[in-house]
Curated annotation (Swiss-Prot):
<comment type="pathway">
    <text>Protein degradation; proteasomal Pup-dependent pathway.</text>
</comment>
<dbReference type="GO" id="GO:0005737">
    <property type="term" value="C:cytoplasm"/>
</dbReference>
<keyword id="KW-0647">Proteasome</keyword>
<dbReference type="GO" id="GO:0004298">
    <property type="term" value="F:threonine-type endopeptidase activity"/>
</dbReference>
<comment type="function">
    <text>Component of the proteasome core, a large protease complex with broad specificity involved in protein degradation.</text>
</comment>
<dbReference type="InterPro" id="IPR022296">
    <property type="entry name" value="Proteasome_asu_bac"/>
</dbReference>
<dbReference type="GO" id="GO:0010498">
    <property type="term" value="P:proteasomal protein catabolic process"/>
</dbReference>
<dbReference type="GO" id="GO:0019941">
    <property type="term" value="P:modification-dependent protein catabolic process"/>
</dbReference>
<protein>
    <recommendedName>
        <fullName>Proteasome subunit alpha</fullName>
    </recommendedName>
</protein>
<dbReference type="Pfam" id="PF00227">
    <property type="entry name" value="Proteasome"/>
</dbReference>
<comment type="subunit">
    <text>The 20S proteasome core is composed of 14 alpha and 14 beta subunits that assemble into four stacked heptameric rings, resulting in a barrel-shaped structure. The two inner rings, each composed of seven catalytic beta subunits, are sandwiched by two outer rings, each composed of seven alpha subunits. The catalytic chamber with the active sites is on the inside of the barrel. Has a gated structure, the ends of the cylinder being occluded by the N-termini of the alpha-subunits. Is capped by the proteasome-associated ATPase, ARC.</text>
</comment>
<comment type="similarity">
    <text>Belongs to the peptidase T1A family.</text>
</comment>
<dbReference type="GO" id="GO:0019773">
    <property type="term" value="C:proteasome core complex, alpha-subunit complex"/>
</dbReference>
<feature type="region of interest" description="Disordered">
    <location>
        <begin position="235"/>
        <end position="256"/>
    </location>
</feature>
<keyword id="KW-0963">Cytoplasm</keyword>
<dbReference type="InterPro" id="IPR001353">
    <property type="entry name" value="Proteasome_sua/b"/>
</dbReference>
<dbReference type="InterPro" id="IPR029055">
    <property type="entry name" value="Ntn_hydrolases_N"/>
</dbReference>
Length: 256
């Protein structure tokens, strides 16, 4: 006599968690950190068309690690939610915490009710409206719908432990854009060296970089273009130190 296959709820949740964690770890790493001018996003991403960093709304940005098709669906859903709410009420009613909560509820439902969990980890960041002095906010949302606010930085995807360790050792509050970019890239290179033994493999062509600029009047999100990033990394590679220079001028050095 054969018995029906049975798996305990605890075992099912463990297997779902393991599947999601392995999928996220296979992806490339992403760093989001607070700096003096807002929030900086730096992602390992050799693709120019499949972007891991995005604007969600006027003062809110998004970054993700894991399976592209899954987090891109979430990204587009977040944009639609924000646009609808901003149109129906007021643009200031759209906040990073609100969007992070929506993502947490969505991922939690998928994790418990669907056949397969999403293999994604998300970061939602928000900067203050122009003229306000509220500090930036970072929210990490994991595959099971867990949400946490992070005061300084978020690391997702790939080999996170060496990147997190490097950031704990080198992160500086109120760093300017130049210093923050160097801190983030050095941390990502530490992760690259840990996984494949080669820091030099992480060059400007394999990086996607953007910022939420608190000093912009309306839309804070800006992408850092390749020439500006090449200049920053050239100085980093040649000097081997963070240096004390001011942040580079972004006029003509970024794009929407």
């Amino acid at each position: 006599m054969s018995f029906p296959y049975f798996i305990s709820p605890e075992q099912a949740m463990r297997e779902r968690s393991e599947l999601a964690r392995k999928g996220i770890a296979r992806g490339k790493s992403v760093v989001a950190l607070v700096y003096a001018g807002g929030v900086l996003f730096v992602a390992e991403n050799p693709s120019r068309s499949l972007q891991k960093i995005s604007e969600l709304y006027d003062r809110v940005g998004f970054a993700a690690a894991g399976k592209f098709n899954e987090f891109d669906n979430l990204r587009r859903g977040g944009i639609q939610f924000a646009d609808t709410r901003g149109y129906a009420y007021d643009r200031r009613d759209v906040t990073g915490r609100q969007l992070a909560n929506v993502y947490a509820q969505t991922l939690g439902t998928i994790f418990t009710e669907q056949a397969k969990p999403y293999e994604v980890e998300l970061c939602v960041a928000e900067v203050a409206h122009y003229g306000e002095t509220k500090p930036p906010e970072l929210y990490r949302i994991t595959y099971d719908g867990s949400i946490a606010d992070e005061p300084h930085f978020v690391v997702m995807g790939g080999t996170t432990e060496p990147i997190t360790t490097a950031l704990k050792d080198s992160y500086a509050e109120n760093a300017n854009l130049r210093e923050a970019t160097r801190i983030a890239v050095r941390a990502l290179r530490a992760g690259s060296e840990s996984s494949n033994g080669d820091q030099s493999a992480l060059d400007v062509g394999s990086l996607e970089v953007a910022i939420l600029d608190v000093n912009r009047p309306r839309r804070a999100f800006r992408r850092i273009n390749r020439p500006t990033l090449e200049n920053l990394l050239r100085e980093l590679d040649s000097n081997g130190s963070d240096g004390n220079g001011d942040a580079p001028e972004l006029n003509g050095g970024s794009s929407d």
